[in-house]
Amino acid sequence: MTCLDPKTIWPNEAVPNVRYRDFSKMVLFTAGDEDQFERKRSYKNGTNPDKKVSLDGNIWTNLFVPNEGLETEFWNGYNLNASSTINTFDYMFNKFKKGIFVKIVDNKVVTFLPFSKHGYKNDWGDLMKYDPSKYKSMIDFMRHVSNQTAIANNKNYKFKPDQVSRYTNQWYSNNCLIRYEHPLSEGDTNVVTLRHMFDELCATREVPDIELFINRRDFPLLTKNGTEPYYNIFGKDHSLDSKSLKLISEGMCPILSMCTSDMYADIVIPTHEDWARVASTEGVKTHVGDKENNENSLPKKITFPPQCKDYSKDNFNTPWEKRIPTAVFRGGSTGCGVSSDTNLETFNQRLVAAKISYNSKPDKYNVPLITAGITKWNLRPRKILNEKYLQTINIEKEAPKVSPLTPEEQSKYKYIINIDGHVSAFRLSLEMSMGCCILLVKSKIPNETFGWKMWFSHLLKPYIHYVPVKSDLSDLIEKIQWCRDNDEKCKEISQEALKFYQTYLSRESILDYMQNLMVKLKLSFPTNEIVYGTDPLFIQNSVQSKYLFNMMNNSINPIFPFLTPYLIPKPIPIYNILGTSLRGSYGWSKGYSMFLKHMFKPTIPKEKDNLKENANQNERKLNEKLNEESRVFTENQQENDWEMKRSTINLKGVFEKRLFENKKSTVDLYSISGSNVVKKSTSDAQGMIEHINEAFISDTCINNLLKIIPNFAWSFAFEKSLNENGVEQCTLLNEYIEGETFSTSIKNKMSYLGFSSGKPFKNVLEVLFQIILSIQFAQEQCGFIHNDLTPWNIIIQTLKEPITIQYPLFSGIYKIITKHVPVIIDYGKSHVATSPYGDFCFNELSVGNVIHYGVVNMFNMIECQDVFSIILYSCLDMLTVNGTKFSQRENDETEYDEQSIIKMLNFFSPTELKTRKEALSFIYQYKKYENLIKAHETINLEKSPIEFIKYFTSIFKKEKVVYGLSRLDSKRTGLIMDFNNPKQIFDEAFAQNIQEVYISFLNVPQNLYKCTLPQPKTKIELYMVAQLLIKCLKDTLKDYRIFAEKSSLRKESFHNDIIKFENAINFITTFYSKEISKHGNDSWVIPELCENNQIEISRNYFRTTSDTLNYSIKPCTDLTFFKKTILNILNWTDDEGLFEIKAEDRVEISTQLKFVLESTFKDKKISANNNTYIVYKKYCNKKYCI
């Protein structure tokens, strides 16, 4: 007999979850967080979701009555739309920790996904109490349980206090049975068996498309009346929490359990024991080693890991007359009770049976009436209904343990007692095949009319299939004696039970039952089909990919062929860094980016069949470009004499070193034309989504921020191709930032070059303030949220001399004087609100169509998410550096002040933290990424980043960080960030000689006369265009002066060229001054709003084929662009005062455009057919948002 090998049958599912080490024992991949669940489950639609399935020949068609007496066969709170799937996962995952999601499409199991919440926290921990009259502490009680278990089972257990979780809200339960181990031992026993049962169902029966959940607990999970299902913990008729009630009210996906009762909505299915039994006794058709399985193939017998139990070995053929007239029971001490005393509410039916057997005497022939006993003690703590304290079995008061008996040995008795354990004893179906007369003990649960039921229980009839026994077993001896007195009747009952087994508990019957269940579920609800729209994450990804592809193909085409040697001018530094690297200015970076995009521009295949080959060629071309010997111009000159000579140099093979590598991703450092570039490549599906998102966000948002502030890294170019193995991959070329990570700096107590010695906390604040100000600026400019802002995603660059960085926020201009510049990297998980069509409203597609893009929390803009993240991890690093000793000395500036750290955390904590232990507990509560990104659900993160700085400076008077509010200084800003004209840089890159470099500068003013100047109709737009053109000309003129000085240009030519630039500036000044004068009496208004505003729907899981989205809400006009434009215009300064806004105009603008300047973020939601569609956030104002 073959024991099934999951790795062979389901190679893509039988893989470890590398994210969680304690999931190592799982045979099938088990999702440990919501992100993994969403990624692993299928969103595939069936080809015929409305197909009708015939039940002709199905023996369960007229027998299936899961909710006898109700109008419908199923609880009416169930639904089959996809929002119900989300609700049910939320309910099971967060409240009960475990479950399995099953999705069947086109008669195949496309998703079988176990899940178990890592970092689970319950809502009943405060109800777990020990008896203080017996035990000193909870640990003392657990020590007692451990010692008793060791004695009872003859084991040499050694109690270890650190293996008990000290936090009761981290325990989990199976109704009354409590698990408290630390760390929790995760497992997936019997999951493989259930996986195979569903595969066999789809292979041998026609079933509809459907989504379901399987309960992995013994106890059912969902009551029909909205009360807590775990009544032993909460008490009888205790209402569910408000969140659970809300989820249930919105609709639940069917939950399949192996046991239920009339008080529960769970739908019963055959147990894993049922399927394991028939697979080994009757055989199955799927996964048995045959290449093909069909209806005519013979079933083959298999077993399932980890036990690989073979039920076919048992021989139940002992004739009735030769069986012993004794009632037998063997089993563990499972169940909620802890005593054999039936006078107590805490009695345990199995302990009662064992005590009855222990005290009973044999008959006159020395044949016992009963042989019942416990074979293994389960002393796990119980929380029992109406009991205040946790309980466990006192083995000294119970009958002693007895030797086990195999099923075959038990079948030699005439009568067999079936007693519930935690719920119904799953062995009942096996016992019905043994030829014994079953004594079935009634369930002991709060209301005896609600007995535990399995999938076939409603077909069983007393004195036909079994002999009933009262729940307290008070008539057990009487019933055994009745059996002896009615031997023929009991023989008949045993034979009827066997017939029932052969008819209804066979392999064919199990599959018929499951088919009948699927079909009737599908027909029982008004929404009987699930048709997924395309996941907006992939819609977004395709939009971003198209944008990036167009940007690559629309890059400027130079005159010269590709193999022409290039001249990339050396970066004009924005500041001098301690080290070997230079950071290029905004203009240089823009031009360098254009150069790289042209180099790696993909070619469009003429034929579809050539796509793969073309992608391979692109990949080879990319590597060739990165690794070829680059031909560049070098300088060979005397002082003040620049003679450009062509020469060829080898850039060390271009490849410098590998920075990072795993199975699916690499990060390499390259040198391209003398500049360091980071090449990031990945073939992982989620990694590619994040790479595309990073490239898109950089191009539409981050790179533009570098005009003003230096706290972000530039992304130059993007490529999507196939690697050498034919696997699709994405490649990013990003700016290389030299320095150490913020995390390393903190751990080194900020002792890196240039930091103030002995003042680590002050130095941390200096960095944090810059990070927070840059995040605030990025949010205001383009709705940027990093979503993974940690100290290791920030590089600290230390400068030779201090610089002043200005952050022009909506609330004012903040200045920081510093030698330490934090640069934020890695935007794969980030979010922006941007338009892929450009920055300026020169076409109707720009303004009002700002859409939210992102991978994490796609449709949520959580303003303080990044601040919370960086503060949380920075505090953890600081506390870790300090070690376990608490810093008591107030003036000890060589250590991180822990009281200050705690105060930082109190900005977020809903309850005041006072001690190091409380601070660490708060940090570890959110430290895991899946908890971090959901933190907004439990704490207030709707504050703006700047509020943290205001909070911190108000309580930390002694920590003086040099920053303040002022008017924007354009001169200082220009010296830090603004140099060059990107078009001129690009032209210079492809210049063949110094003459062409020279021409690239002169083309800037000359091209001005060849173009049609924009002539907008509002004063706001006129000022914006004029300021931008003046800035472009003056920045290029500054760069030209540097070039002229280095190239020793003739003075006459130099002066003539300066005149050309000045004439162009005068031309722009005259032209726009007249245009502004024409509109001098006009009001200050924003341009006419675009009519074709979009509404982006969130993850569109919820549409069915018949569903149409009807909404009466009008699109919300986005005011982000206008707000930024107005503030930029107001903050504009010029050496000559050109186009500066006058004081009286400032007053008018602040009054007439107040609604724009005061616009805030706002959510909008739409509902259709009970399905919630989330509209993206945008800047709104009542005047423009209805």
UniProtKB/Swiss-Prot annotation:
InterPro entries, per the entry: CAP10, Kinase-like_dom_sf, O-Glucosyltr/Glycosyltrsf_90, Tyr_kinase_AS
Gene3D superfamilies, A to Z: Transferase(Phosphotransferase) domain 1 (1.10.510.10)
Disulfide bonds: none
SMART domains with a match to the protein in the record: CAP10
Domain of life: Viruses
GO MF annotation, one: protein kinase activity
Protein name: Uncharacterized protein 179R
Originating species: Invertebrate iridescent virus 6 (IIV-6)
